[in-house]
């Protein structure tokens, strides 16, 4: 696979988010435990039997196994600390009817739920409830069937499947089909799709949410709906309105997109000294959203070197839908400052490019996509996001570099927009960050277990976020919903959602689409059955 090497950093914090919460009332009084009542109720409301030893996990029965299941897909390790709230038990359904039954029974018994597919959400809302306790966890990891139909250029995908599994199953059937989804192959489809979902094909084909054809979803009454049954308003809301507000999607029908047999990837790293006048990073800001849509170039900025000799590296990771000869000609004309050469480029298939961007070692077999784990491991981290509308001037860049050097184990990921992202109206789906957006920033800081610098790293995120205010979007200052940040604000306890408070953080994620989301929520879930710390609120009665 040539000289291009994946950057061993951030692929798996380009994440997905699946958090669903369930209505909570005063628990039913009974001699039997809530756990027993729940299981008995589910059995009465499903036609598919299930072995308890494979579907029910409790700390009382087997704390080791319970912890193993709880931790299995949790990606942000700070939320597995002993001080964090834990579910009373975990139920892992093996059939969609058991998800329907879980909703029906939660209403009857007054149990508060969180639902998880891949566990990559930044604030752990899919497996931690700060606002309502006790709660239980519905784990969808066993609902992972994928049916690819090349003749119709489509596929049905269940929420527990990962992006890597989806990519593998597509490539298994065709070398010239793909799907515009994310870099991190261990992300679960379930939540990823609900936030819109972006990746290296976004400039050519838009978001994952832009390429959804149909769904199967369970609503607040436990009813199974498809696109025709739910209507276009609800279908619109669930393709980018964030998980946990409208229902549980049990399967997505997605549109496959054409990809060439040959894809070219490249990696070019420049230090601050090599780009002392900042011409390369400045030119990237100008052209990355305007270059032909077959090219996607993201940049990772981070500190490097020893304490006495620190610098900043800017790593340009690119993908071109075509052969390297064509790429080099385009880059020489549009972005000569990068100095891209033939030896920087590697030709490969689309599925091999997925391995490259996922951070897998060069030469890894594509079957590694079925292992479900990220090659980069898990992390203790804090992250947030911004959207940039105008190029950041040199003085602003210098302030960023200064803070990166001070932050140590921190980095920024800049993802270019433009292309198809500028052509799709911001009201097409709830994800509104379209025409006029140059690039998105991910701010990221990580630390080790029991690291005394954790509070400093969290403060670093807050400080650089404040510093960047003059250089990013405003009124509202926008953010990506799949990069949830509770520092923007959150709903309060129980079902008492303050619409005024939600108006503070809601437009950050959705801009003007937030009001439409609230209207749809009020219509389909007026009792606020599905909720979490940043779920869409219904209008007050």
Curated annotation (Swiss-Prot):
What does UniProt say on post-translational modification here? The FAD cofactor is bound via a bicovalent 6-S-cysteinyl, 8alpha-N1-histidyl FAD linkage.
* UniProt-recorded Gene Ontology molecular function terms: FAD binding; oxidoreductase activity
Q: Which UniProt keywords are listed?
A: Cell wall, Disulfide bond, FAD, Flavoprotein, Glycoprotein, Nucleotide-binding, Oxidoreductase, Secreted, Signal
Family affiliation: Belongs to the oxygen-dependent FAD-linked oxidoreductase family.
A biological process from GO: response to oxidative stress
Give all residue intervals belonging to the FAD-binding PCMH-type domain: 83-259
This protein is called what? Berberine bridge enzyme-like 24
Q: Where is the signal peptide?
A: 1-32
């Amino acid at each position: 696979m040539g000289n291009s090497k994946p950057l061993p950093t951030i692929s798996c914090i380009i994440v997905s988010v699946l958090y669903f919460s369930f209505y909570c009332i005063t628990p039913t009084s009974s001699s039997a435990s809530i756990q027993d009542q729940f299981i008995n109720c589910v059995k009465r409301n499903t036609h598919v039997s299930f072995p308890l030893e494979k579907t029910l996990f409790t700390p009382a029965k087997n704390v080791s196994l319970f912890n193993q299941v709880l931790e299995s897909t949790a990606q942000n390790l700070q939320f597995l600390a002993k001080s964090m709230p834990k579910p009373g038990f975990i139920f892992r359904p093996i059939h969609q009817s058991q998800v329907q039954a879980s909703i029906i029974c939660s209403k009857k018994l007054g149990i508060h739920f969180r639902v998880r597919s891949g566990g990559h959400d930044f604030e752990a809302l899919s497996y931690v409830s700060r606002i309502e306790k006790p709660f239980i966890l519905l784990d969808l990891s066993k609902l992972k069937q994928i049916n690819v139909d090349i003749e119709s250029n489509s596929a049905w995908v269940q929420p527990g499947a990962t992006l890597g599994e989806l990519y593998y199953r597509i490539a298994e059937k065709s070398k010239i089909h793909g799907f515009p989804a994310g870099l991190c192959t261990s992300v679960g489809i379930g939540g990823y799709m609900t936030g819109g979902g972006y990746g290296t094909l976004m400039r050519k084909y838009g978001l994952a949410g832009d390429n959804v054809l149909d769904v199967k979803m369970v609503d607040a009454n436990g009813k199974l709906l498809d696109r025709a049954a739910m209507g276009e308003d609800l279908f619109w809301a669930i393709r980018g309105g964030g998980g946990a507000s409208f229902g549980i999607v049990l399967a997505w029908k997605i549109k496959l997109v054409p990809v060439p047999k040959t894809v070219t990837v490249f990696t070019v790293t420049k230090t601050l000294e090599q780009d002392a006048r900042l011409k390369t990073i400045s030119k990237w800001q100008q052209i990355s959203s305007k270059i032909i849509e077959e090219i996607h170039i993201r940049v990772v900025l981070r500190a490097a070197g020893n304490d006495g000799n620190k610098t900043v590296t800017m790593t340009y990771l690119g993908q071109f839908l075509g052969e390297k000869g064509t790429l080099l000609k385009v880059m020489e004309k549009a972005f000569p400052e990068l100095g891209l050469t033939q030896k920087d480029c590697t030709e490969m298939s689309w599925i091999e490019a997925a391995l490259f961007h996922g951070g897998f070692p060069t030469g890894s077999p594509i079957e590694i996509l079925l292992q479900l784990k990220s090659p980069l491991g898990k992390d203790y981290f804090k992250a947030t996001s911004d959207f940039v509308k105008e190029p950041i001037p040199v003085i602003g860049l210098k302030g960023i570099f200064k803070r990166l050097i001070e932050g140590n184990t921190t980095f920024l990921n800049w993802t270019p927009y433009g292309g198809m992202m500028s052509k799709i109206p911001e009201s097409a789906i709830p994800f509104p960050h379209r025409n006029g957006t140059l690039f998105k920033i991910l701010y990221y800081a990580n630390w080790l277990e029991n690291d005394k610098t954790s509070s400093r790293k969290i403060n670093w995120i807050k400080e650089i976020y404040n510093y960047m205010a003059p250089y990013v979007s405003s009124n509202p200052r926008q953010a990506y919903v799949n990069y949830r940040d509770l520092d923007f604000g959150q709903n309060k306890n129980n079902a008492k959602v303050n619409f005024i408070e939600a108006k503070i953080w809601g437009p950050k994620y959705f801009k003007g689409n937030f009001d439409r989301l609230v209207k749809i929520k009020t219509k389909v879930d007026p009792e606020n059955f599905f909720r979490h710390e940043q779920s869409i609120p219904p209008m007050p009665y």
